[in-house]
Amino acid sequence: MNHAKRLRTLRRHMAAAGIESLLVTHLADVRYLCGFGGSNAALAIGRGRASLFTDGRYTVQAKQETSGAKVFIAEKSALREACASLAASGVAHVVFDPSSTTVADLEVMRAAIPSNQRRGFFRHSSTSLVADLRMVKDAEELVRMEEAALLGCRLFEELLPKIASGVQETTIAAELEYAARRNGAEGMSFATIVASGPRAALPHGHATSAAVPRSGFVVLDFGVILKGYCSDMTRTVFIGKASDDERFAYDSVRDAQQAAVDAVIPGVSSGEVDEAARSVLRKAGLAQYFTHSTGHGVGIEIHEAPRVAAAQTQVLTPGMVITIEPGIYLEGKFGIRIEDMVVVTDQAGRVITPASKALIEL
């Protein structure tokens, strides 16, 4: 990854926004900008240089991973020393991201600088400059994300023979997660969702000791982390033979998902993509059971900008990677969700999770 190039791009955005210096504390942003992946870090971007502050646990790791920034090992607080260094450099102000800064953090930041500099020294941004950069992936990021997405598809296909009536949801999740590790994944993008029978009506129904019923839908929502990037996909399968009503519900969700994928075109808003899915479910009389947004960005983190939701005005541009995941949830009965990762190209959306979306009856 070309971290020096990312820092140069960020500096141009800072200059355009009139920002003299920036304090980055969100760990995913730190990793994006300089490569360091430790659990304690503050990146100070000031006049002409970027400085990474961490603690003694990461002395070796920081040297190995960091590029584009000078590494400093803090004796006490990395955040405090990062702020002190910016104050000592003579900058007039420091901008921070309030979405990743707690009240306790702010107290540490203020205590780090002389009292005569505190007034107006720290300013919060209304938007995250780094999040805006992370929305559009470069060529190397896209390669890594497609590798992660394709691994997820292979894992799903290998898992299908192990899904059966009487098998515990946790067993299915364990099989999936073990296979992910065996195939090179660094971990899972989030807690694996295996929700069967009436539990499928829980949008975030994490795997439990519940046994898969003799008949009904099973929602499988999972992702892997590969080479530092997340994948995310959902497929819904059926145990037994689906009834006409169940098949109609499944086909409606699949049609809604495809309509949203087809709506992914550079220049449209993410809100328009959301509406494409909802309109199909509205015509099918099922829109009231679609209770969440249609999707989100993916990258270093499982949930990134942009949001794909009603009334969102973010314009889609080439290089964005989003999920398209409409679902319906009928309490006490069943749930269905189908999700793909989609890359926005120069002309359309390209699905990078090509596993079958036909109704699979096991």
Q: Which sequence ranges carry the predicted segments?
A:
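Active-site neighborhoods and metal-handling regions in enzymes and metal-associated proteins
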Residues: 1-362
